[in-house]
Regions:
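Short, low-complexity N-terminal intrinsically disordered segments enriched in polar/charged residues
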Residues: 1-29, 38, 135-138
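A short, polar/proline- and glycine-enriched secondary-structure boundary/capping micro-motif
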Residues: 95-98, 131-137
Length: 138
């Protein structure tokens, strides 16, 4: 398997970890020992324990009963033992509070590093799709 194929597979596993809000799956793809960072619209998490508790637990697990993250248009650039992945995504969910459906679209950048021969996520930054209206996006 090439590095690019391994990274594409890792992104698929990342989506599965989100869809199931499963930190056991997530721990197989994140660098759980490093200085990892996850920037998302509801906050910034520093370190694996914060990502596990606040993003997987409080955001994905507590807020939604169903989740489906659909990554698309992956662009992978490998730089030795580091890689950058950029992709668009669509997220379908059911809100736990009232059962209402939620559909959002966005974009994501992931920085990965290869440790022990395996790719791991070191940094994620995701946001909604760009806005182009007057006085938007600043």
């Amino acid at each position: 398997m090439t590095d690019k194929q391994a990274i594409e597979s890792l992104v698929a596993t990342y989506a599965e970890s989100i869809n199931k809000a499963d930190t056991d799956i997530a721990s197989t793809i994140w660098d759980t020992t490093g200085d990892v960072v996850f920037i998302h619209p509801r906050g910034t998490e520093y370190g694996w324990e914060a990502i596990k508790a606040n993003f997987y637990g409080k955001t994905m697990g507590d807020m939604f009963t169903k989740r489906e993250l659909k990554p698309r248009d992956l662009s992978v650039a490998v730089f030795g033992d580091m890689a950058v992945v950029v992709f668009m995504w669509e997220f379908h969910a059911t809100c736990r509070a009232d059962g209402a459906p939620l559909v959002t679209e966005g974009r994501e950048t992931q920085v990965m590093r290869k440790t022990g021969g395996k790719w791991r996520i070191a940094h994620v930054h995701y946001s909604n799709m760009p806005v182009t209206g007057d006085k938007q996006g600043f």
